[in-house]
């Protein structure tokens, strides 16, 4: 089985190996993928997704390390257009003068026509879920750069790859498959970390989960997409969130998740639990009623505290890092289902423990409010 090879420089800008001619860059909590052989010529490789806002320079440095200083991609392919996958797309499309491809049902959100269905911050039981209420939701407009991905299933600039429709997490979500070795770029059709938990998202603890609950507006389609991907028995996969996964661990995990999707992946309650957002080629058509909870009273405080913790978390020394790990280990946050996040602090290199404590305190306060 192939092992993940990591070569980290001082800035963390060197892509990591997933499979032959497939590497990825971790941009804080989201992955950006590079399809192409190291040293590929100008326009001889493809970028998949564009990370968080402000990540253009890191992506360009990573591309230069992979393919050379002057090498530009043949195309940018978007698995979907959520803010954490298109953060640098404006800058990169302009500076590289490169086309951006997405499924036709994603185009309304990439051409300024429609906002996505709003997130549901009260599902998933983690700080990241609660923070989602403040995530950017407005559409972007890529203008002349964006176009519909070829209907024949081919992936521009990536011979040997094809795209697969995997809607649910987003109306026009796609994943990429290389049949020759059953390698998948999944996007957010499933994840390999518990993305609803800020601690897990920051520490990248490896475990298979469904799509991020807070941003998934159609659970029936999400389940069908996961079952479809599991049917390929992929040998390797890189998702939008979490480390690469391979072999039997990946295959067994996907099979189990597909078999228990409604229990393990679909939230126990929430706005989209039983009633999806209705969308079409023009964007959002109709939304299920908003489920208001007194928990929203503390939402702003949690989001602000977590955001501050993230902003100040990088570049900590080893002593502080060990202190943070210990806090996260000893002070688990409790999710909506009563499950503990204690083990998610393992290997933390951020102030994840502080965020975990904050989430726990606020969740306990919310429970008291809801009980009144």
Regions found by a protein language model. Give the residues of each.
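Active-site HxH/HxHxD metal-binding segment of metal-dependent hydrolases
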Residues: 54-57, 64-147
